[in-house]
UniProtKB/Swiss-Prot annotation:
This is UPF0113 protein AF_0058. Gene3D superfamilies: PUA domain. Belongs to the UPF0113 family. InterPro entries: NIP7_N, PUA, PUA-like_sf, PUA_sf, UPF0113_PUA. Residues 87-161 form the PUA domain. GO terms for molecular function: RNA binding. Pfam families: pre-PUA_NIP7, UPF0113.
Length: 174
């Protein structure tokens, strides 16, 4: 599949998402490419690389920052490049971090703090160093956190940094 520029509708969806998460200036430093397959994958590339992509026709280029459809869905790699503010974030303690990286959901007792968001929102799970550990969906609004029992699931794990390790096939030993 060849890369192409995002069309007007896709660019509008992407810009809206970037602005919402405080990364509207991303497009002044990088160019976007769309690779169509089963999904419309969006890649960020340097302006220099963008100039030679058409000549090379590569299979891969840049960093996949997400997928676009009716909405823009950040990839895990994209969150590291794009998230510049504290919107829709949950910060967890060390135990919550470990469990989340093992694929578990976030319990209310593991949350150290949370920015403001509503129930059923997409949230970015961070450790105390502000590293994005993954993406989840809130089961409750941030306002409800203080009233929840510690063993109640607060954020459902959608994707985390440990997922690629769990899905790696290991070789067979004899």
């Amino acid at each position: 599949m060849a890369f192409r520029q995002p069309n007007t509708k896709e660019l509008k969806v992407i810009r809206k998402a970037l602005s919402y998460y405080g990364s509207g200036d991303f497009l002044s430093h990088y160019a976007l490419l769309v690779k169509e397959g089963e999904k419309k994958e969006v890649y960020g590339v340097s302006k220099e690389l963008y100039g030679v992509i058409g000549e090379l026709n590569p299979h891969y280029a840049g960093v996949k920052i997400g997928e676009v459809g009716r909405r823009f869905r950040f990839s895990l790699e994209g969150t590291f490049w794009l998230l510049r503010n504290s919107r829709n974030r949950v910060w967890v303690n060390e135990r919550g971090e470990m469990l989340f990286l093992y694929g578990r959901d976030i319990f209310a007792g593991s949350v150290e703090r949370a920015s403001e968001f509503g129930e059923n929102s997409i949230v970015f799970v961070c450790n105390r160093f502000d590293d994005v550990l993954g993406i989840g969906r809130s089961r409750h609004s941030s306002d409800e956190l203080s009233n929840l029992p510690e063993d109640k699931v607060f954020v459902e794990n959608l994707v985390d940094r440990g997922e690629y390790l769990r899905h790696q096939k290991t070789y067979l030993s004899f």
